[in-house]
Amino acid sequence: MTAIPIFIISDSIGETARTVIAAVNAQFPASVTLKIQRFPFITDQKTLTPILQDAHQEQAIIVSTLVNHTLQETVTQFCQAKHLTLIDLLSPLTTAISERSQTASLETPGSLRKLDEHYFHRISAMEFAVRYDDGQDPRGLLEADIVLLGVSRTSKTPLSMYLANQNYRVANLPLIPNVPLPKELFKVPAHKIIGLTMPLSTLLKIRQERLATLGLPQTTNYSNMTTVGDELAYANQIFEQLNATTINVADRSIEETASLIQTLI
């Protein structure tokens, strides 16, 4: 079967049309193929006219995401005159919302793409959280919006990732007795540092369950009451030394703790 020609015409990058076409194409067997040509950043009649002529020559389906009413009207009239199939993705909904709200649309190309900048910031924050998870690189402590400290199993990593999804750059560092702390930590402003803790009994239970899940014996320092108690005491000492805000994460969901942190920083 000959590939079906499709022209995407947009005054932005045409990603909205591409996504819709991909979703529709997935509903057909592999024998149905599309020849997609994308024409982005079309902002004047001079550029638009030859594209429409080429579409006519190829008998293409035109998929448009033009926010400029004048340009879209040109496409509509051309398709009607030449009997071309036109899929106008934006105009029907734009008109409906405009009529219902009694408000004219902005006709600003790329508005959705500008919103996508928020997405890229979030991805950057998540990459930051992965790079500086578990004290992998202490240099991240100085670049972070939030620094999480705590002994093992106090939810440092899941909290880091959740907060990163809220656009915060988060680094976390495990507190282990007799392991020197990086010098960078003492340069971080106190208001950025959050100490995570919980009662000894709760932490012991969590660690014991962790060992059971891994099929490991319970007779290790990891779940020894005295050792774990010493870890918590050491962590509290560091929190006090750094003047860090301390949060008891026991019986709190990740979402609840993250929300509390956001109100504190």
Swiss-Prot record:
ADP binds at residues 150-157. It catalyses: N(tele)-phospho-L-histidyl/L-threonyl-[pyruvate, phosphate dikinase] + ADP = N(tele)-phospho-L-histidyl/O-phospho-L-threonyl-[pyruvate, phosphate dikinase] + AMP + H(+); N(tele)-phospho-L-histidyl/O-phospho-L-threonyl-[pyruvate, phosphate dikinase] + phosphate + H(+) = N(tele)-phospho-L-histidyl/L-threonyl-[pyruvate, phosphate dikinase] + diphosphate. GO terms for molecular function: ADP binding; ATP binding; phosphotransferase activity, phosphate group as acceptor; protein serine/threonine kinase activity. Keywords: Kinase, Nucleotide-binding, Serine/threonine-protein kinase, Transferase. It is an enzyme of class 2 (transferase). It holds the Pfam family Kinase-PPPase. Its EC number is 2.7.11.32, 2.7.4.27. PANTHER family: PYRUVATE, PHOSPHATE DIKINASE REGULATORY PROTEIN 1, CHLOROPLASTIC. Bifunctional serine/threonine kinase and phosphorylase involved in the regulation of the pyruvate, phosphate dikinase (PPDK) by catalyzing its phosphorylation/dephosphorylation. Belongs to the pyruvate, phosphate/water dikinase regulatory protein family. PDRP subfamily. This is Putative pyruvate, phosphate dikinase regulatory protein 2. It comes from Latilactobacillus sakei subsp. sakei (strain 23K). The lineage of its organism: Bacteria, Bacillati, Bacillota, Bacilli, Lactobacillales.
